[in-house]
Structures are given as structure tokens and as C-alpha cells.
Amino acid sequence: MKLTLLAGITFMLCSCTAETIAESNAVPQECNSETTQVSAIELANTPLPERSGARIQTTGRVPHTQVGFDPVAEINDELFKLAFMLPGLQERPTIVSLPGATGMWLADDVSVVKPAAIVSGREFAHIHSDGSLHAPLPLERALELEQKGWGERHPWADRNQGWEGLVMLYSASNEDELKILVQLVTESYNHVTGRSAAPPNC
């Protein structure tokens, strides 16, 4: 009886140890930053959901910034991590926006198919410290996201040819909003580069 009980305890201890070792040796899930077979057109044609909650207030003029919004630090950190996983992006100080914003620069080896959509240099978009962004999109998408509450067209969107789809994307307050925000950043990247990158995720 004692031998049977001892054997059972030994088996349980060994099983737990084996499970612990297996868990500690598990390969971490890698983040996705690969291209996809889904074309940029198909991604851009996927209807956006309605954004819940009140529309975020902005200045409505240049400098075009959000007003009275308190960013969520964890969501902001995740936005920066995911946005700069897109291929060939460099994180630099902005040359377009206010000090403190972060420019999203295309590396020299990344082709640009819509240079007129970029305001200056190779900084196709920038992220403000509160997690809002300015980025170019196709006009149809810009109008849709404005209608569904995800952002608004820039006050200078009608000033220059190519800027028609220049938008502010509102800050994300939770993971669901962050997913849409990263999708739209990816669509902007695809719009100016002609690539078909998938939205990065971890």
C-alpha cells in the first residue's frame, strides 16, 4: 500500500515538473510583420465598424490636435510597437508636426508610388504624443472613417493635390480601437508604397 502511494506521488511530481519544463521551454509567439496575400485594395475595401463613444474633440485648425483627451499609456506603447513593425519604417523626430511628435519615415529602399500624398520628405505619417496620428489614405476611406467616427480630414486636405485623403486618426482608448488604428496605419503605408502589408499584431 505504501509503495503504491509513493509511486503515485512520484508520478504526480514528475508530471508537474515535466509540464513546468515544457512551459518554460515554449517558443514565444512571434509578432506578425509579414506581407499577406490579401491585397491592399481588399484590405481598404473592408468596411470599418462604427466607433463607439463620443467623437474626440480637436482644434479643427492648424496646428491640428486633439483637445481634452487623456491617452492610455499601455495602449500608446502598443501602438508605437506595432506601427513601427511595418517593413522599412524608421522612427525619427517629425519634420512636419509639432515638437514631441514622432515621424514615421520610409527607408530609402522603400518605393513610393504616391509621393504627392506625403506632406514632406519620406515622412508619410506621424504619431502625436497622445497617440493620435496624421496619415494619408484614399479619399473614399478618409470620408468613411470620418463618417464612422475614427477620425477626420485634415483642415488642409483640400489645399494640395494628393492631400485629399490626409486625415487625423483619433487616439485609441482600448485594444479594439487599437486594432482598427493599426489597420488604418497599415492601409496608409500600403497606399503610399503600393505594398500589401498585413496589419502587424502580436
What function would you assign to each model-found segment?
Residues 1-7:
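Sec-dependent signal peptide recognition
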Residues 13-15:
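C-terminal motif of bacterial Sec signal peptides marking the signal peptidase cleavage site
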Residues 17-23:
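Bacterial lipoprotein signal-peptidase II cleavage site
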Residues 25-202:
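Charge-dense, helix-prone N-terminal extensions
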